[in-house]
């Protein structure tokens, strides 16, 4: 039986607390709407490796992360990756549950050393190919921030839209990858990190880092560090730590009874020439993968995914999803979106959803507040990959994302001979105005008329309409464009432009 641990616990505790702090910021930013949380979310998401690699103008972040990894090891995985911290958190919870049941003392193995599989190198290569050819589904499936973001988006859907059957089903579908990873983490720790495209890529650089975890000659091969390692990268019999898979959790230093596991210089000068060549070869491969993905991606958009041909042939209509303002078109949007769901979290109106399970879009089927706010640019502000291009408030006010269709035969003015005008009152651009309407035997009324030149597809008319079924429908446009702007009051002529007073007239 191993002696009581005499290793320094401070590094492991401090590192874990920092990682928990970063995770707490992520959870707060995803689940708490507001300008502060959106600012934090934009900063955190744009600092993620895959988002920076795939995003425009974020090459500096990629280079900084690679440089830090090349010197210190996988610091990014240690404290900045929220999915890694989630795995480690549940790994610790699993350990407490096993300890409570006494199973650890009866020899139930939790992780232990697992020989690395060379097949894992195929994951970042395939993802890099997807980045180059604008094929994001591969990244969406295996990327850590995408997986974590969809899980948080699922929780937000439950909180913001209630617990209906449809919402619950959607939330479960979005969270399935995260749930599976958490279940595996209970017993196998950070097993996903061995196959994560970001982890594998950074691992190549980490293997060449002069600093890292090392085992001294005083190691007694007791195996305690091997069992406690959430990454399964310690071979206690061989007295070796796999620097590629080590996530710098410092658990080994905290439990080592002889103090043999430590972080420091790994003896670069004493490494054989052959080993150095292996290190440099791995780092070179990683550099080529990252460089090709970042540099060639924008220039090879002509090699778009095959499904783009089908998407381009779709006509305007309800078959197209209504995309967030700044998404340009479906090809651009799906070719850059990594499904981190930061836009879902940032939307103050809670109308950005992901009913297709991957790429978010606008859903106007909710309550009466379900309209894209006229002055809001939050989704374009937090998007890390420019799938939603950044818009100014003035550009947002003129960006057409959909077109309304007015069915006057459904309007309460026509069906119930009641005064209304709610649609014209809430329309922010003046696409809807009121004109005189009369029928024999009914009092003087006004009716809405619609001018699509001013319509931006915000959905305010649909949200405010009291008719059943509603007198408006919305259809996405194939290509977002700028309208002529809002209708000036002096151009209304004989039309009666209803001023927005903040209250519906019924």
What are these regions (language model features)?
Residues 1-239, 244-245, 250-506:
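Non-ligating segments of multi-cofactor redox enzymes
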């Amino acid at each position: 039986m191993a002696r009581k641990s005499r290793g320094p616990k401070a590094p492991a505790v401090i590192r874990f607390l920092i990682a928990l702090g970063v995770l707490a910021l992520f959870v707060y930013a995803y689940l708490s709407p507001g300008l502060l949380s959106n600012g934090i979310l934009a900063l955190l998401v744009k600092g993620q490796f895959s988002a920076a690699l795939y995003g425009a103008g974020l090459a500096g972040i990629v280079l900084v992360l690679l440089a830090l990894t090349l010197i210190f090891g996988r610091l990014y995985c240690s404290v900045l990756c929220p999915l890694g911290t989630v795995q480690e958190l549940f790994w610790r919870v699993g350990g407490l549950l096993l300890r409570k049941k006494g199973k650890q003392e009866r020899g139930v193995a939790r992780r232990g050393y697992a020989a690395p599989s060379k097949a894992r190198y195929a994951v970042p290569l395939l993802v890099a190919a997807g980045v180059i050819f604008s094929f994001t589904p591969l990244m969406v499936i295996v990327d850590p921030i995408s997986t974590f973001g969809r899980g948080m988006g699922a929780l937000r859907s439950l909180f913001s839209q209630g617990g209906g059957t449809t919402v619950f089903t959607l939330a479960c579908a979005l969270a399935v990858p995260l749930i599976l990873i958490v279940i595996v983490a209970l017993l196998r720790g950070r097993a996903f990190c061995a196959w994560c495209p970001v982890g594998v890529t950074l691992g190549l650089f980490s293997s060449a880092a002069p600093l890292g975890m090392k085992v001294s000659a005083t190691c007694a091969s007791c195996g305690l560090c091997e069992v406690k390692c959430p990454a399964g990268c310690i071979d206690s019999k061989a007295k070796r730590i796999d620097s590629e898979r080590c996530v710098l959790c410092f658990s080994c230093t905290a439990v080592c009874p002889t103090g043999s596991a430590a972080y420091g210089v790994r003896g670069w000068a004493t490494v054989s020439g052959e080993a150095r060549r292996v290190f440099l070869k791995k780092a070179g491969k990683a550099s080529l993968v990252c460089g090709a993905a970042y540099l060639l991606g924008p220039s090879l958009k002509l090699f778009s995914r095959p499904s783009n041909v089908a998407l381009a042939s779709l006509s305007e209509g309800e078959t197209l999803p209504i995309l967030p303002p700044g998404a340009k078109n479906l090809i651009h949007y799906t070719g850059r979106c990594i499904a981190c769901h930061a836009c879902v979290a940032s939307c103050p109106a809670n109308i950005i959803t992901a009913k297709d399970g991957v790429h978010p879009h606008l859903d106007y089927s909710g309550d009466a507040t379900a309209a894209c706010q006229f002055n809001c640019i939050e989704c374009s502000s937090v998007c890390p990959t420019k799938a939603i291009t950044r818009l100014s408030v003035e550009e947002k006010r003129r960006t057409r994302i959909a077109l309304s269709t007015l069915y006057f035969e459904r309007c309460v003015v026509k069906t119930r001979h009641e005064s209304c005008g709610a649609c014209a009152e809430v329309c922010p651009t003046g696409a809807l105005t009121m004109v005189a309407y009369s029928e024999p035997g009914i009092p003087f009324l006004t009716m809405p008329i619609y001018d699509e030149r001013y319509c931006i597809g915000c959905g305010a008319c649909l949200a405010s309409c009291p008719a059943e079924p509603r007198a408006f429908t919305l259809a996405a446009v194939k290509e977002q464009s700028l309208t002529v702007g809002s209708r000036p009051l002096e151009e209304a002529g004989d039309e009666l432009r209803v001023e927005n007073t903040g209250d519906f007239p019924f």
